[in-house]
């Protein structure tokens, strides 16, 4: 990727959900380091675009191309997209009963470290960074030991996602209705 190339380039994207075409001829370029805001009416496809870019299997790409950091994003599965530096916050983050928050986030961080050729974080190093991130976001440290989003308020869910974002340090973050909850 040249410095002048966009980090994300979407060209003439068409997406179907079931029998319905939801996105028609969507094109956009997002430069690296840019803040890009996509606004539109309810039901106009903003969340669909984010979920499609993240690789959600419900959304079928019927045409167009998407390049992320110079690579064919559509050729990657959801995990490869995340490892490449793509992050999606959900409109309504799901509960994950039985999965401890600190273990879930550490696993994701270490998968990204591995994909970058970096050393995985041990529990001690990860916990130090996670505690700092939680404190900056006004989250009690005890949330790190709770199951992911289980029993969290709407605001706690969103701040928990922001903590994940801070710890993962993605190349591109799509924040879907970050103020909901």
Walk through the language-model features, giving the residues of each:
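Conserved structural motif at the start of ABC-family nucleotide-binding domains
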Residues: 8-10, 23
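Short coil-to-beta microelement around the adenine-binding A-loop and adjacent beta1/P-loop entry
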Residues: 20-21, 36, 80
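The feature captures the beta-strand-to-loop junction immediately N-terminal to the Walker
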Residues: 39-44
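Helix-to-loop junction immediately C-terminal to a conserved catalytic motif
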Residues: 54
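ABC ATPase NBD Q-loop/coupling interface
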Residues: 65-81, 149
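ABC-family P-loop ATPase nucleotide-binding domains
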Residues: 94-171
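Walker B catalytic motif
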Residues: 174-181
């Amino acid at each position: 990727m040249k410095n002048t190339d966009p980090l994300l380039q979407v060209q003439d994207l068409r997406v179907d959900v079931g029998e319905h075409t939801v996105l028609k001829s969507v094109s956009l370029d997002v430069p690296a380091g840019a803040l890009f805001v996509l606004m539109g009416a309810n039901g106009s496809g903003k969340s669909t675009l984010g979920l499609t870019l993240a690789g959600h299997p419900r959304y079928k790409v019927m045409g167009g191309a998407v390049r992320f950091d110079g690579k064919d994003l559509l050729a990657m599965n959801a995990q490869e997209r995340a490892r490449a530096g793509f992050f999606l916050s959900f409109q309504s983050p799901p509960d994950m009963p039985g999965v401890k928050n600190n273990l879930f986030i550490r696993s994701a961080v270490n998968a990204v470290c591995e994909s970058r050729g970096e050393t995985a974080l041990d529990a001690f190093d990860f916990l130090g960074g996670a505690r700092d991130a939680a404190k900056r976001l006004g989250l009690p440290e005890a949330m790190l030991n709770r199951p992911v989003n289980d029993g969290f308020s709407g605001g706690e869910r969103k701040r928990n996602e922001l903590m994940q974002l801070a710890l993962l340090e993605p190349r591109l973050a799509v924040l879907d209705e970050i103020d909901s909850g």
